[in-house]
């Protein structure tokens, strides 16, 4: 379906706005959804339509919730946004923001104190593209596109108390170790490179999976990461490390959880280390997005460990003095799901009322099958009880053994967006494809 026809169908109530007719589990009819229903946002999603959980893709401001993802129609990769009016339950048409280079070009979305939306997207080892909405709390039109940086991939985006934007992305190089760069943008000014804050210890491919979250003071930036480094022809990621650091001055300087100063760009030798793995240790690690308790200011990290053929998810909570309390979520799976692998991607999110929520994947691949995009994948949501002892875990996706329902992205705080008592999750339904440039027709779902 071409872009113009897709916009027409969305506007007239056919196509993606009539999604409930395609999936009996969704109560969405002609673009209307109840808050807890599933809703088909698109049927042209790419292989990573909601991928890279560190990039926030859902923001609520007032009665509007805005959702961004990456499609792959016949004319190439495209970033789209739709808006849910929470008062009426009605969805807007899909509005195109811009292009993506390939399936890595998905967006990161935030909102400032005045309600203007900000979005970064496009690259896979290129400059990022950026736009601001023309009007507050309105995704239907965007200001002229601008670009910044070079050889960047994987965005994170948050908004500071004075509406300065803070952004990180991976920076690749030919002849030296890859890094994570921090950028900022003051209102009305161009993007400015602050500098590298993380660096691999090895030349060549690296991935950092970093996520950002504000402390309650809206000044302290907390960062969780998963270093993936030292790859060669024989092994993809010989060393993996889940780590943490924070900045108490808007990213100017960084320290460990105990306050010990870190010289940046930091390697895993300088930051808090929570878990170690990689091919050489026969342990696979993935990090989800972190969240910070709005009452205590303590960071909550989440990551998965794949070891001896089993996957489990760990939450780690800082005591602010260098210590971490870890808890395994896997034993709290419902009885009929135990025996499956609980894994990231996913993440954590505190609602404005202070309750902790999360998203994860569950899977059980058959022997010899690849776990990446495996049809056994389902997306889960979980919420911690008010006593802080138990988790209620349920499906975010409607179980479907024929389709991978994966890459969940949970709504979370980025500065000025409100987090409802039940944060939304979006996920991709369909396979990854064989190449980064494959144009697929995956479904993209909202789970409210």
Show which residues each predicted segment covers:
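Extracellular, repeat-based ectodomains that mediate carbohydrate processing or recognition
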Residues: 33-448
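N-terminal secretory signal peptides
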Residues: 1-4
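N-terminal export signals
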Residues: 7-28
């Amino acid at each position: 379906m071409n872009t113009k026809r897709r916009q027409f169908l969305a506007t007239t109530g056919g196509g993606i706005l009539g999604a409930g007719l395609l999936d009996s589990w969704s109560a969405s009819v002609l673009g209307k959804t109840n808050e807890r229903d599933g809703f088909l946002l698109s049927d042209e999603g790419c292989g990573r339509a909601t991928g890279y959980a560190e990039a926030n893709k859902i923001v609520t401001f007032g009665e509007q919730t805005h959702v961004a993802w990456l499609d792959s129609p016949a004319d190439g990769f495209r970033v789209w946004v739709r808006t849910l009016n929470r008062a009426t339950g009605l969805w807007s048409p899909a509005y195109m923001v811009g292009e993506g280079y390939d399936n890595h070009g998905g967006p990161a979305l935030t909102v400032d104190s005045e309600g203007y939306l900000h979005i970064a997207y496009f690259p896979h080892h290129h400059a990022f593209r950026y736009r601001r909405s023309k009007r507050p709390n309105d995704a239907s039109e965007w200001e002229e596109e601008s670009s910044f940086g070079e050889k960047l991939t994987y965005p994170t985006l948050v908004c500071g108390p004075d509406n300065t934007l803070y952004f990180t992305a991976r920076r690749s190089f030919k002849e030296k170790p890859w890094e994570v760069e921090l950028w900022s943008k003051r209102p009305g000014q161009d993007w400015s490179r602050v500098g590298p804050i993380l660096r691999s210890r090895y030349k060549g491919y690296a991935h950092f999976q970093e996520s950002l979250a504000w402390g309650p003071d809206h000044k302290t930036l907390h960062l969780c990461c998963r270093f993936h480094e030292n790859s060669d022809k024989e092994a993809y990621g010989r060393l993996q490390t889940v780590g943490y650091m924070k900045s108490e001055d808007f990213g100017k300087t960084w320290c460990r959880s105990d306050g010990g100063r870190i010289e940046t760009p930091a390697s895993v030798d300088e930051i808090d280390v929570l878990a170690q793995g990689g091919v050489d240790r026969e342990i696979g690690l993935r990090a989800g997005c972190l969240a910070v308790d709005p009452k205590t200011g303590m960071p909550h990290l989440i990551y998965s460990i794949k070891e001896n053929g089993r996957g489990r998810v760990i939450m780690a909570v800082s005591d602010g003095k260098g210590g971490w309390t870890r808890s395994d979520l896997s034993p709290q799976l419902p009885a009929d799901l135990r025996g499956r692998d609980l894994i990231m991607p996913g993440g954590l999110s505190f609602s404005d009322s202070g309750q902790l929520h999360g998203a994860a994947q569950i899977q059980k691949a058959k022997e010899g099958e690849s776990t990446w995009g495996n049809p056994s994948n389902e997306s889960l949501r979980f919420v911690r009880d008010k006593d802080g002892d138990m988790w209620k875990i349920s499906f975010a996706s409607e179980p479907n053994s024929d389709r991978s329902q994966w890459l969940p992205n949970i709504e979370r705080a980025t500065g000025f967006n409100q987090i409802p008592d039940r944060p939304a999750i979006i996920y991709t339904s369909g396979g990854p494809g064989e190449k980064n440039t494959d144009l697929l027709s995956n479904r993209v779902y909202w789970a409210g």
